[in-house]
From Swiss-Prot:
InterPro entries: Herpes_UL87_C. It comes from Alcelaphine herpesvirus 1 (strain C500). The gene is 24. This is Uncharacterized gene 24 protein. Belongs to the herpesviridae UL87 family.
Amino acid sequence: MSVLEECCYLPVVSAQQLPEPSDEGYLEDQLEIFGILALNKKLTRAECCLTQLDTLMAPELTFYTCRAARRLLLGLVHVPCVSVGYMPPGMCLHKGSSFSGAGLVFNGYQYYTTNQLTTDTFIPGIRSMEETDPVLDKNFTWRIIYFPKLLTTRVSWTLMFQIISRYVNMYELDECVSLFCNSLNPHLKQVCTYNYSLLTYHLKNPSLQRWPHSSKTVGKTSEEFLLINFLLHWPSSTCLAQLRAKVLKGVKQFPGILQYLSALPVSKAVTVQGLEILKYIECIGLLFPQWAPVLLKRTPKKFTCVITVVNNHTNSSIWLQFPESGAMLRTALCMAVAKHICREKELISPGKQQLSLARALVANFEKMQYAPKDFPIILYPTEIYRPMPVDDQPASDIKNSFNALTHISINSFKVNVFNTNMVINTNITCLQAPCCYSQIVNVPKLVNNFVIKKYSVKEPAFTVSIFYSEDFNLKAAINVNISGDIINFLLAMNTLKCFLPVTDIFPASMANWNSTFDLHGLENQHLVRSGRRDVFWTTNFPSVVSSNEGYNVSWFKAATATVSKIHGSDLTKQVQGEIRRLIGHRHARISFCKNKLFATLESRNCAQIQAAHKRFLECLYECCSWFRANTNALTQLVQCGAFDFSKRIIAHSKSRHECALCGYKVCNSIPKVIINHKKTRLDDCGRNANFLSYLHRGAPHMINTKAKLFKHICRRASLRSYHFAGCAKAKEWSKALRLAHQMPS
């Protein structure tokens, strides 16, 4: 083996300039050269591809790229040398004119420097002045990086510039070159300037012949394609079907108008004769709210994306102003009335300006900013590639934003947030009524109430409120109150068409979103409503409100909360902040085994736990704990489905949707039990009450047993008297705790 077969640093004892090899090799050869200059590492055959190079460059992208650029600017030099030992087969050093002076002597794995050497062989290397380079010999200031690839392949400046542009932009490259050149002596500064001109030489003479020349035929086809593609992405709606057909007809019959509108800048207004275009404005405003035009009766201050509608009968004008992002919608709307467009001939340019070199370069650099930089380039068979790690990014689609059940976990504390109901506002259009006042709700126009009709549907459970409108044939505003996910809402909208003559349903907007969640495993549940500075009591509602970032979380007894107005990621963030403050409280005592048990049960049944199930499982858990049994067995039974339930078995709320399914009488009949010869509702302490919360309510003749249970729970949960501070029955709890400690075990 020889040192000539490895990548190494060598001292520059005497620098000479010789012609480089004529062959630039392939892309992988240039990637290998760049990898050595940037990473100080010889790339393997599998790593000589862009995707693998991206992975290697990722830790210090800018530093590695600038290091390679600095070494390229210093250029390639040849050092006189002679090999007296083993010479690898097929390796041939560069030949030049005879030289006498200082040089290198290679002998196997070693090399020596000498001041008296006569040779005609030279070893190539790229000069390096990095602070990270090793110190070879104090007698020689300069050093080169040698690798065998330089013996057969020359550096391709064009490819090197393309690789550098993959990781840094032109401004960063210029800044790197400028700072580096300012630190060099005049000779090396001149060398860097010359090599930088080689690196950017192809920018001075770009290949203009590769750019397609514009023609009228190509421009016409492109404009038609863009407009038709825009129309095909419109939603399926009967009110848009007629407009789409008219636009397509206008594109076919008036291609000149389309070219005129495409060439017209957004700062120029389009003039339309007649009021026919106005009948599509309301439909477009409902279906495309982000591009909805504004109807102006006065001249707009800023003529951007404006349509001037001229009334031929009154000689008056109306202006439609679109957002700048709605320029394509303006073109489509004008093509629907293409025969009424007033075309201004002076706006058509007589000739096209010649493309300048500077504008072509600017366009190229702008395209580089948006070009994909992670496309795979397969240079070798796929079996030699190592699998690339892929980051799992959460999907941000509309379905995940409107989940009926959201799972949240903070430090292994799990919470399930349920959607109780959502209020959605939208608009509908209906069939034409044959009579003058017989409309979809069968009421005369003299009735001008806020809500004139309300429908309740059992399956899927939802209610629809219809607001008063002057003409229901054009548009009617409705309010939908429904629970569930977005699929349930789509089913409800299709069910609405079964009993109302609905022809179109316009895009909906979320008016309100109500959610609720329970904290399971918190032993001192009173902590959520007392002992906190960030809550306040409401005067007309038995709850404590925690207000943060403009949103309120209402806490009821037994650690149950409701959240309104927000959904999706905002809801998750709000609940996380609320829970983090509670479980991080210094007096909070949490049973993670209980938390896992009840959270798993909620996830399996997709419903909050009812009062009867909660009490049964709380008692069963405390019995297992009292008799030193394995409480994890309950969690395993829950996971097997032994305690599954249906939310419709026992009513636990007065939700209007449950009432629509079961009836009001059933929903109002909360189960009652006889305690102390008195009927008591199961949820008198709260639907989510734990064992400590209702221990004092039952069995008054079993005082000693309850005291022992209370002492056992306090010992297991490390509860002290100050943990009950702020509770409504704090004195009773403290007294019971003292008595329990005085009792023998």
